[in-house]
Amino acid sequence: MTKRFSTPDISDKYSDSLAINIQFRSFGKKEYFCGQVKTAQCPEDNSKVKEILSQDGSGQVLLVDGNGSSKVALLGDMIAKQAIENSWEGVIINGCVRDVEILKVLSLGIFAIGSCPVR
């Protein structure tokens, strides 16, 4: 049985060490996901995201720091499908995604701050 945690409970428990003040939106079909976190810094360039998600991601979540840029998308449908094929649980992006109509039907957790059609 999986134990559920609410965001406010986690924030209360770890208030000394949490400093995220970003409003993420869900873009994928999976609303809940968890796993070991792998990080990547990718300001306005998704090549590293593509490279990482092309590898086995069993039980992992990719956390991408795109510096909050809304100039380009760091994830689209093709890279998201690749992530699913490689067993990733989800992707959290401090930046934008594209192909939102397709992303919302893919069985992948995807959170980002917005969408942008430019790659």
Each model region followed by its residue ranges:
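Feature captures the catalytic cores and cofactor-binding loops of soluble hydro-lyases/lyases
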Residues: 2-119
